[in-house]
Amino acid sequence: MANNTPFAAQPLLTSSELPLTLISLDDWALVTLTGADRVKYLQGQVTADIDALPTDQHVLCAHCDAKGKMWSNLRLFYRGEGLAFIERRSVLDNQLSELKKYAVFSKVVIAAQPDAVLLGVAGTQAKAVLAEVFAELPNADHPVVQQGDSTLLYFSLPAERFLLVTDTEQAQQLVEKLADRAQFNNSKQWLALDIEAGFPIIDTDSSAQFIPQATNIQALNGISFSKGCYTGQEMVARAKYRGANKRALYWLAGSANRAPAVGEDLEWQLGENWRRTGSVLAAITLSDGTVWVQAVLNNDLAADSVLRVRDDAESVLTIQPLPYSLTEDK
């Protein structure tokens, strides 16, 4: 298979409906950091404590500007001799140039890896099928496993699924193995699962717009409040200790004539009136016509609030429960 050639689009399904599915993650990109200073350098750039990251764990953290606004969020893990992270392809070039700004002063090489193949495996029997190909699989206790040139990541949300970072040869083997047994789909299916999981999606139109807490990164254990300095730390800390953050990530579901675009606001019902509010991070339409929206909204929104897509009077969107708690330890 060609590198990151997307599979044909299929109807999108919820995690509970999904049959065995191999997903081309062409909307995501891989970056690696190698060199003696890789950990030290990244420690000064992202919200997670890289010094404390075990080699068998991955973390969703944020890379911020000096004002604490996220250039991107990063799914960070060890791969081979270095560190690696996955982010949305749309923000890759800009985020990478920001991350590299001070790299000339350190022994670190930061590089996109366009030849790497990213695949998702989800749905019924995903684990059993991968066990036929790989000697060891990641799990809830050890969510990162290295095998040869492949790195496997385990996710429990919204249901058991796997992300594979590999080369063209191994990817082709998996494609052939699953040819008669699995549905193939493109990145939109993985996006749907991320929305269901409450994992924030940062694309170009939402880059440098939000502090990490506005997208629930703290609830996903992606912010260390005890590590040393990193870019944007002061603003991120202020949001926690001074209550400066008034927003949160929400998963909305319902009916609409269209899926709203990234960066659009929504309309919130107040009695007989509608008020514009929030900002859309991602939206998809499922096979049954249901629209899912991931949006940043006021964090004091009542659970029974009714929203709609802007200028769509027939639209009705309601708040769905996220599979994790937003209650913070004080």
UniProtKB/Swiss-Prot annotation:
The lineage of its organism: Bacteria, Pseudomonadati, Pseudomonadota, Gammaproteobacteria, Enterobacterales. This is tRNA-modifying protein YgfZ. Keywords: Cytoplasm, Folate-binding, tRNA processing. Belongs to the tRNA-modifying YgfZ family. GO terms for cellular component: cytoplasm. InterPro entries: GCV_T_N (IPR006222), GcvT/YgfZ_C (IPR029043), tRNA-modifying_YgfZ (IPR023758), YgfZ/GcvT (IPR045179), YgfZ/GcvT_CS (IPR017703), YgfZ_barrel (IPR048451). One of its GO terms (molecular function) is folic acid binding. One of its GO terms (biological process) is tRNA processing. The keyword tRNA processing applies.
